Regions:
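Short, flexible loop motifs at catalytic/binding sites
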Residues: 1-113, 117-217
Length: 217
């Protein structure tokens, strides 16, 4: 978004300072403020429209995981997806809307093809935002490894400005006093109500719940 200073500089460059010298400073200030308000309104309207369109294309009723990856996580995917990645993306897309049907899925990808990024990071967030998952658990060979995967999710939810602007429900939840609840390295709860746990292969997950919700993935 352009700053007020840059807006004024643009007006001056287009109109020329010589033509403005005949107006009192107070009149110019009022004129500048009016233009700034109108410009800010246009920017806000354009931003809201973009947000609505992107949310619909990514996580709406017919939202596509492929668009979600490209639009919000383009910094991970600089090249076109290969056949193995496309197959995994299609698998994740197919999980949507299958909350009631238990699903077991196995998909092998070559090393370095982004298994963890596509599924554990982006796939987990997309399935939460589409309300397919509400309480997933990330299980890895060790607790530290699982925490590393969860930390990647935390990093994106803290630093990915476009993702946060379009999905504020991915911010940390607030307590009854309205204060932000700090995330733990193995357990995070979002404003939207979803929760993610990180566990090692030998750690017990029995009895885990969030209010009335038990782990669903």
């Amino acid at each position: 978004m352009a700053s007020n200073q840059s807006i004024r500089q643009r007006i001056l460059s287009e109109l020329g300072s010589s033509g403005l010298n005949r107006f009192p400073p107070q009149v110019l200030e009022l004129a500048f403020r009016r233009v700034e308000r109108e410009y800010a309104g246009q920017i806000t309207e354009s931003t809201n429209r973009e947000k609505s369109v992107c949310r619909r294309r990514a996580t709406g009723k017919r939202g596509q995981f492929h668009f979600f990856l490209r639009h919000y996580f383009g910094h991970y995917f600089g090249s076109p997806f290969g056949p193995q990645q496309k197959a995994l993306i299609e698998d994740i897309q197919a999980l949507r809307g299958r909350q009631r049907d238990p699903v077991k899925m196995t998909r092998a990808l070559s090393r370095g093809f982004g298994k963890s990024t596509v599924l554990t990071l982006c796939g987990t967030l997309w399935l939460i935002l589409t309300r397919t998952w509400n309480f997933p658990i990330i299980i890895s060979s060790s607790l530290e490894s699982a925490k590393g995967f969860l930390q990647a999710i935390i990093d994106e939810c803290e630093d990915n400005a476009v993702l946060l602007e379009h999905y504020p429900e991915l911010r940390p939840k607030k307590d009854q006093k309205g204060q932000t609840v700090s995330w733990k390295d193995g357990d995070i709860v979002f404003q939207g109500g979803a929760r993610i746990l990180a566990k090692g292969f030998l750690n017990s997950i029995r009895g885990k719940r969030r209010k009335e919700s038990r782990p669903d993935a």
